[in-house]
Amino acid sequence: MSASAATGVFVLSLSAIPVTYVFNHLAAQHDSWTIVGVAALILFLVALLARVLVKRKPPRDPLFYVYAVFGFTSVVNLIIGLEQDGIIDGFMTHYLREGEPYLNTAYGHMICYWDGSAHYLMYLVMVAAIAWEETYRTIGLYWVGSIIMSVVVFVPGNIVGKYGTRICPAFFLSIPYTCLPVWAGFRIYNQPSENYNYPSKVIQEAQAKDLLRRPFDLMLVVCLLLATGFCLFRGLIALDCPSELCRLYTQFQEPYLKDPAAYPKIQMLVYMFYSVPYFVTALYGLVVPGCSWMPDITLIHAGGLAQAQFSHIGASLHARTAYVYRVPEEAKILFLALNIAYGVLPQLLAYRCIYKPEFFIKTKAEEKVE
């Protein structure tokens, strides 16, 4: 493959601009099932055009076509975000009103911006890597964590939240977004991991140091313990814990946790049942040397937390959130400090695992034992 294939995918994604404009005007004249059929046809044509772009030398990695289609939908989501902010008009108005009204929520607004910016950049990078036959395993795992986190919160939130009674046929367009990332995740994970050619002496010296002689790791351990407590606390709030402390926190710090849209409640439960076990596992990995799985699960978790905290912070402060559920003005500094710190911690841990992996590399003796 040549670099022109990656450029072609970029241009193909930009075709979403005229396509959404025409689609919006057609959607206003047809029923919901017709809209779903046309949308599915458009996505199929995008995949077909991506295949035409690389007809002479098709990629070895079939995920090229997945990223091409998802890149197109990322531009669509960016258009939705811009239209919701009143920057543009007439592109997705009817679809937002009749197709997926839950995208009009503050949370829906934020995930549109995340998909249209962060995910879009990841797709372009991964497409370029495939075109140049380079590995993209690191950014691929980060993307897997990010998109699966958005699906795990957004799809159930649409069903159990206040828009649950307004589920339209367009909801079925979420099926590819649910299935394809899982398939992609397995393919990316099974790609060859990076080989670290560190001398045995360097690895042994790094692994011989206990936690007290690794100040950065010690700081991470302390932060992970605090983050675990924070996750459990907000999870209890999501489960309607009657404790006075939970009531006060919800009332004066994060009233958004009680938003009837249900996204924040599901997000806190995901943190409780997904992040807490991860934090415990990461604590083990930072104490016991040779845990070669640490970089991979850390990347996946870092991607998920980046998406989740961006959406949660943005929705908590967004004007589309009812005033009674927005973060009070006097609580904003503490709210931002806690939530930004919680979102940054997994990124620091991922940086630690990827760029200084000596502590997590298995020695040859350990590999022989296995």
UniProtKB/Swiss-Prot annotation:
- Per UniProt, what is the membrane topology? Multi-pass membrane protein
Listed A to Z, the keywords are:
Lysosome, Membrane, Repeat, Transmembrane, Transmembrane helix
Keyword flag Repeat: yes
Q: Does the keyword Glycoprotein apply?
A: no
Primary place of residence?
membrane
**Which PANTHER family does this entry report, sorted A to Z?**
TRANSMEMBRANE 6 SUPERFAMILY MEMBER 1, TRANSMEMBRANE SUPERFAMILY 6 MEMBER 1/2
Encoding gene, per UniProt annotation: TM6SF1
Similarity remark: Belongs to the TM6SF family.
Q: Which InterPro entries match?
A: EXPERA (IPR033118), TM6SF1-like (IPR047195)
Q: What does this protein do?
A: May function as sterol isomerase.
Q: Which GO terms describe its cellular component?
A: lysosomal membrane
Domain EXPERA, chain residue ranges per copy: 60-185, 216-350
Name of the protein: Transmembrane 6 superfamily member 1
Which locations, inside or outside the cell, does it occupy? Answer: Lysosome membrane
Q: Where are the transmembrane segments?
A: 3-23, 34-54, 62-82, 110-130, 139-159, 166-186, 218-238, 268-288, 331-351
